[in-house]
Amino acid sequence: MKQILDFIPLIIFFALYKMYDIYTATGALIIATAIQLVVTYALYKKVEKMQLITFIMVTVFGGMTIFLHDDNFIKWKVTIVYCVFAAGLIIAHILGKPVIKGMLGKEVTLPDDKWAKINHAWVLFFTVCAIANLYVAFEMPLDVWVNFKVFGLLGLTFLYTLFTGMYVYKHMPKEKKEEQE
């Protein structure tokens, strides 16, 4: 259910962009992201930091897009969010508080060096996505960027999550694998 909630604002953004324009879609994205935050809190009594960061970025950059009537701001939002996520993972690693281990460590037992590799891999992923977004956003037509944002980055994230899951499964202790089968 929670994963479905995460995609609703993006689906609304895409649909309204195709029906109207980037400004209508951006306004709807801000509203849908705010509603998503409220619903998530109502259902789970907590909001993840990533959701909160995304909401703040959507509101600030989306608001600037609408107020200044300049779609460059919403394009920059995607790159900045990816950079913030990458920086957050780096800082957490330096401070000895691995974020991904914190998210999955209760369900999955892995050696710390494997958690570090997963962390570094996600830093690389977010960095590549940030750079790719910059290229597509500012070198391609708006329609191409919207499709890339919705389908390209979402598809890449899904695949990377799948590959991370395969890596985790490969390195799980044998007794944990047997429990899950």
UniProtKB/Swiss-Prot annotation:
Assigned GO CC terms: plasma membrane
Keywords: Cell inner membrane, Cell membrane, Membrane, Transmembrane, Transmembrane helix
Positions of transmembrane segments: 22-42, 50-70, 80-100, 122-142, 148-168
Cell compartment(s), UniProt: Cell inner membrane
Membrane topology: Multi-pass membrane protein
Known function: Plays a role in cell envelope biogenesis, maintenance of cell envelope integrity and membrane homeostasis.
Family, as annotated: Belongs to the YciB family.
PANTHER family, alphabetized: INNER MEMBRANE-SPANNING PROTEIN YCIB (PTHR36917:SF1), INTRACELLULAR SEPTATION PROTEIN A-RELATED (PTHR36917)
HAMAP family listed in its UniProt record: YciB
Protein name: Inner membrane-spanning protein YciB
